[in-house]
Amino acid sequence: MDLMSFILLWAGLMKVAEASIAQFSQLGASAPGNIIIGGLFPIHEAVVPVNYTGNNSISAPEHPDCIRFYTKGLNQALAMINAVEMANKSPMLSSLNITLGYRIYDTCSDVTTALRAVHDIMRPFSDCESPEDSSQPVQPIMAVIGTTSSEISIAVARDLNLQMIPQISYASTATILSDKSRFPAFMRTVPSDEYQTCAMAKLLKSNKWSWVGIIITDGDYGRSALEGFIQHTETEGICIAFKAILPDSLADQQKLNTDIENTLNIIENNPKVRVVISFAKSSQMQLLFKGLQSRNISNNMVWVASDNWSTAKHILNDGSITDIGKVLGFTFKSGNFTSFHQYLKNLQFESEDEMNNSFLKEFLKLNAGNASNTVLELMKSTNLDKIFSIEMAVTAVANAVAKLCAERQCQDSTALQPWELLRQLRSITFENGGEMYKFDANGDINLGYDLFLWEGDQSDEHADDIIAEYDPTKGGFHYIHNDLSEIKKVVSRCSNSCQPGQYKKTAEGQHTCCYECLTCVENHYSNITDADECSPCDSESMWSLANSTECHPKVFEYFDWNSGFAIVLLILAALGVLLLFFMSALFFWQRHSPVVKAAGGPLCHLILVSLLGSFISVVFFVGEPSDLTCRARQVIFGFSFTLCVSCILVKSLKILLAFEMNFELKELLCMLYKPYMIVSVGMGVQIIICTVWLTLYKPFKDKEVQTESILLECNEGFYVMFWLMLGYIALLALFCFTFAYIGRKLPQKYNEAKFITFSMVICLMAWIIFIPIHVTTSGKYVPAVEMVVILISNYGILSCHFLPKSYIILFKKEHNTKDAFMKNVYEYARKSAENIKGLTGTEPQFKQENSVYTISNLSFVPEEKHE
């Protein structure tokens, strides 16, 4: 290799080395100090893209060209400078005779550029640009304040983790940065997006906005925010109608414009979406709002702004907020910014050679060197929440440094290590603006959010009203302004609300927020708006009609005492009892009269007593049933009526025996006629039936649950026993009817058999009719059916057996004599004998026995023949 070639090669290597070291420094502001703090701020919004697609396009790395000066970024850098100067003046550091210095870099809102700045921060060799002593080593940076973008902070944090240099961000909110296993050196003075997305979901829920859109910037911040927002909206029952993703880089204007147009089309094609949440950049929202105004899309919308652009009112493009709708912005908590504004007013713009802030130089040039106009622009671009967060970050570092340097000499830059400062920061409690603050276990300071409502136009940068505060610890909003009627009028729903009494039915494959409203069926209800399903009523005790908002208690139904029908039947029963008492008294008074003796004598009183029991049994069929009444009513009636019919059976046999002219038949009847035995046997069989019934299959109170009521009724236990009891009574009545029918042609004045026949016909017919009615009838009036039949039977016997005799006793006294009665009997006997002679042609023959029934004995009790 000749000398010339060696010289050229050496020159090339030196040029590359120069490019790799000097040209990549984005240092724009610096100040000396015992402890140096780094700052990373977006002084510019983008870098000029370099095309590396062609083979010939690959060249040595070049210094990036940053474009689009960002005034708010400069403002943030100045806030850090002001905070450092204030800390140096505080007794906390001045008493230790130490100062903080700073080196502030421009990230140009670009990850690669930010990493180049971090490389410069961590460079262990001399700063080539040192004007004083190039051999003096550059002081290491103990902590870094920044950055704004979560995506840049994530990349920067990975590099700073290598030396455990604490990084305190004032605006990066991505949830992933709270993961200390991945980002142990990262801290921040703002809450995580986990809380912001949760607050947004609660805001949507409280205003019943369930059909919304979301716009994000592609990158770690946007993706993380989208993921967290989806998680919280699913919990709150909110659906995302569309997701629009804008490019992270602002340099490729063509791609950005295309994505903005696509987003505008999406918004236009979703007219039901009136609420849009945006985590995009302010410059992207500026283009989006400009497109909305040009397309004349409805301004009846609500835009929910993340902290990324919530205070950037300059994006209105000389328009009014009414042109795009309403903007609700989430901002971090802020404090007193008077000192910072005073700092801006006191800025001294010296000659360029004397100024140590190249960023300020550039901004001054952009304002044509007009210092007063420069200050005015800076004051208008102040983000109060970010200024407060930056001041808090610097204050935290100053307190941690003071704590460490109180125990050691920190004039030497090697006396303190970054990891020691990080450890102290994680545990420090510091004061700022009269309040005490501390980083939590995730390295975050969670102060919550202010919710702003944009007012006025872009010129009113600070005219917004705080309408609410969100406290993450309580998980709710505290509204400062209650008059939010205009916001609450905005409806953002896929489907109209389902009213109480309805429920939502979502078609398969659709969003849960898109549904149709169906009416709740019977015995189901919904008492809230947009119920997911109708709740069933307790079928045992509650009921509801279709489209009901509540369940109604089921009413207990039974044959009530207040029922008009029950009152009528009870009056009839009471009247029957009164008649019984009257007839009992009358028959007892006339117990020796021929009519009473002919009616059965003592048996009459026994029949009256049995009818009294039958009338009383009617009372047990009315009112709320119980186990006792269910068992008592049938048994009382069964015993009473069996006794009554048994006595009537005795009467039937006695009448047949008294007037029977056929000796052989009379002899048979004499053998069968044992009055007390007949009554005892008749009652005994019924007692056996009822005893078995009450022992094995006892009736009980039962309930039948119906649609709107609960029917309380008596369950007879075993209906075979019930019908057996009634069947036995019917059998006795049939015997009575048969015997009475045989002896129906008695003397005209004494036609007891006919009355028995009529009474038994009435009873049998009533109970025959009762059978189909009882079987087919249901409801609370079932007991009334049996009551009616019992009363008919009782009154039938009372009317046929006792009323005619009472009439004779009271009004036909001439017939109530022995002579009148004997005359009728002899007349009946004479006619019977003539009828027999006419039929046979011979005189009737009567066989005499020791014992005869004398017709003169009106009680039909056999008397002995005297010889």
From Swiss-Prot:
Membrane-crossing residue ranges in chain numbering: 567-587, 603-623, 635-655, 676-696, 717-737, 755-775, 782-802
GO CC annotations, alphabetized: plasma membrane
Cytoplasmic compartment segments: 588-602, 656-675, 738-754, 803-867
Residue numbers on the Extracellular membrane side: 20-566, 624-634, 697-716, 776-781
Signal peptide: 1-19
Residues carrying covalently attached carbohydrate according to the record: N51, N55, N97, N296, N308, N336, N356, N370, N527, N547
Pfam families on file: 7tm_3 (PF00003), ANF_receptor (PF01094), NCD3G (PF07562)
Cellular location(s): Cell membrane
GO biological process, one term: sensory perception of smell
Membrane topology note: Multi-pass membrane protein
InterPro entries named in the record: ANF_lig-bd_rcpt, GPCR_3, GPCR_3_9-Cys_dom, GPCR_3_9-Cys_sf, GPCR_3_C, GPCR_3_Ca_sens_rcpt-rel, GPCR_3_CS, Peripla_BP_I
GO molecular-function terms, A-Z: amino acid binding; G protein-coupled receptor activity; glutamate binding
Top-level taxon of the source organism: Eukaryota
Keywords tagged on the record: Cell membrane, Disulfide bond, G-protein coupled receptor, Glycoprotein, Membrane, Olfaction, Receptor, Sensory transduction, Signal, Transducer, Transmembrane, Transmembrane helix
Site label Critical determinant of selectivity of acidic versus basic amino acid ligands, positions: K386
Protein function: Olfactory receptor that is activated by amino acids that act as potent odorants in fish. Displays preference for acidic amino acids such as Glu over basic amino acids.
SUBUNIT field: Homodimer; disulfide-linked.
Family according to the record: Belongs to the G-protein coupled receptor 3 family.
Protein known as: G-protein coupled receptor family C group 6 member A
Organism: Danio rerio
Gene label: gprc6a
